[in-house]
Swiss-Prot record:
Listed CDD domains: ATP-synt_V_A-type_beta_C (cd18112), ATP-synt_V_A-type_beta_N (cd18118), V_A-ATPase_B (cd01135)
Organism ancestry: Archaea, Methanobacteriati, Methanobacteriota, Stenosarchaea group, Methanomicrobia
Pfam hit, one: ATP-synt_VA_C
Encoding gene per record: atpB
PROSITE patterns assigned: ATPASE_ALPHA_BETA
Membrane topology of this protein: Peripheral membrane protein
Protein species of origin: Methanoregula boonei (strain DSM 21154 / JCM 14090 / 6A8)
Cellular component per GO, a single term: plasma membrane
Protein's recorded name: A-type ATP synthase subunit B
Chief place of localization: membrane
Function: Component of the A-type ATP synthase that produces ATP from ADP in the presence of a proton gradient across the membrane. The B chain is a regulatory subunit.
Family annotation (SUPFAM superfamilies): C-terminal domain of alpha and beta subunits of F1 ATP synthase, P-loop containing nucleoside triphosphate hydrolases
NCBIfam families: ATP_syn_B_arch, PRK04196.1
Family per record: Belongs to the ATPase alpha/beta chains family.
Length: 462
């Protein structure tokens, strides 16, 4: 262990130390104060004669005469089966009043990118119990599908509902949820803990909570701790793991804060130029590995500043991930929960996990027809505001009514309502039955005869 007393500068969470020997990147550091207190940090940058250390807590009490000890080790996450059912801080320490976790292994939190050749193509449907996701923007095991939200919208409720209800229908394989919250208030943290305990979802979950008043540096390691835990459960214990990360905007703000303290040249809107690479290091840790039983599926959640989908955070996230679920303020104002707008939403891997052998043979066609009907009906609302409803044709009035029914019956559902994929598709058929059969141009005739409620009822009478 190397020790120096050569602190030259302290800026925010960063401590600058002169050194004479080589120091490794991301090496753990112990800073000993004059009263014997030890503060922990990590090497953020190293050059020929200077090391930048980021402190995992406040820099209060650190002086030029404080001892700086370089341990020669990187951050490792203690992992084990005992983690299931536990609530941990953003730094990986138990905060639920339970005993310390006895680790089976200690793993480097940086992880490693999955070799593209070793990746298996995602193909298994994950049922979230939310119709707007399962029916029209299906989540597939091994996918990374973000939720784009805005300040004040109920994305945390959606996250908790997914964490509680997510499952692979008909599968007997072990399923777990790793939930990591970053930059949340104490009120939100209490709400998360109470909801997990009330619903019993905590039994198969590991929860990490980083509070808003915790150091920004801790916010940087929280998602990495969560993903290291998920990779252990998936690839060493053979479990299928869903990782929910909220709120990635707070994570990116922490990146910007640390970048400013390091006096880096800023990129777009003040965010570091390497933010794309940094986010990719997190998102790309999802997937399925050939020959391995487990999988890691990711749902990162972020709030778009000013509801701007072109902001660097959602913009870069969209480049890396495989689609997006968009939470809409207008639907929220109408009192609709979950306020998910299916029109700008997209799941790029949806077609790999639906259809015969996965969900149901009519899934793709029903989804396409509902999307087309809702899109046209939604466009007609703008026309009605100009010319009035009476000026519409009978066909247009039917589509306008379909758009209202779609929001009220399909999009709207209860916080504790867990719909099966059969419930979702049957509900879709009920809505489509309000339109004339000849307008269902995106559905094959044999599927209409088999699933259309009115035609099914007629066939039974005969």
């Amino acid at each position: 262990m190397k020790e120096y007393r050569t602190i030259t500068k302290i800026a925010g969470p960063l401590v600058f130390v002169e050194k004479t020997e080589p120091i490794g990147y991301q090496e753990l550091v112990n800073i000993v104060l004059s009263d014997g207190t030890i503060k922990r940090g990590q090497v953020l940058d190293t050059s020929d004669d200077l090391v930048v250390v980021q402190i995992f807590e406040t820099t209060t009490g650190i002086g030029r005469d404080s001892g700086v000890r370089f341990t020669g080790e990187t951050i490792k996450m203690p992992v084990g089966r005992e983690m299931l059912g536990r609530i941990l801080s953003g730094g990986g320490k138990p905060i639920d009043g339970g005993p310390e976790i006895v680790p089976e292994k200690r793993l480097d939190i940086t992880g490693a990118a999955i070799n593209p050749w070793a990746r298996n193509s995602p193909s298994d449907f994950i049922q979230t119990g939310i119709s707007t996701i399962d029916g029209t923007n299906t989540l597939v095991r091994g996918q990374k599908l973000p939720i784009f939200s805005g300040a004040g919208l109920p994305h945390n409720n959606v996250a908790l509902q997914i964490a509680r209800q997510a499952k692979v229908p008909g599968s007997t394989e072990s399923f777990a949820v790793v939930f990591a919250a970053m930059g949340i208030t104490k009120e939100e943290a209490n709400y998360f803990m109470q909801d997990f305990e009330r619903t019993g979802a905590l039994e198969h979950a590991v929860v990490f909570l980083n509070l808003a008043d915790d150091p920004a540096v801790e916010r940087i390691i929280t998602p990495r701790l969560a993903l290291t835990t998920a990779e252990y459960l998936a690839f060493e214990l053979g479990m299928h793991v869903l990782v929910i990360l909220t709120d990635m905007t707070n994570y990116c703000e922490a990146l910007r804060q640390i970048g400013a303290a390091r006096e880096e040249v800023p990129g777009r809107r003040g965010y570091p130029g390497y933010m794309y690479t940094d986010l990719a290091c997190i998102y790309e840790r999802a997937g399925i590995i050939k020959g391995q039983k487990g999988s890691v599926t990711q749902i990162p959640i972020l709030t778009m500043p000013g509801d701007d989908i072109t902001h660097p955070i959602p913009d870069l996230t969209g480049y890396i991930t495989e689609g997006q679920i968009v939470v809409n303020r207008e639907l929220h104002r109408k009192g609709i929960y979950p306020p998910i707008n299916v029109l700008p939403s997209l799941s790029r891997l949806m077609n790999l996990g639906i259809g015969k052998g996965h969900t149901r043979e009519d899934h793709k066609k029903v989804s396409d027809q509902m999307y087309a009907g809702y899109a046209e009906g939604n466009d007609l609302r703008g026309l009605v505001a100009i010319v009035g409803k009476d000026a519409l044709s009978e066909r247009d009035r039917g589509l306008l009514e379909f758009a209202d029914l779609f929001e009220d019956k399909f999009v709207r559902q209860g916080y504790d309502e867990d719909r099966t994929i059969e419930d979702t598709l049957d509900l879709g058929w009920d809505l489509l039955s309000t339109l004339p059969v000849e307008q269902l141009t995106r559905i094959d005739r044999d599927l209409i005869n088999k699933y259309h409620p009115k035609l099914k009822a007629g066939a039974k009478k005969e």
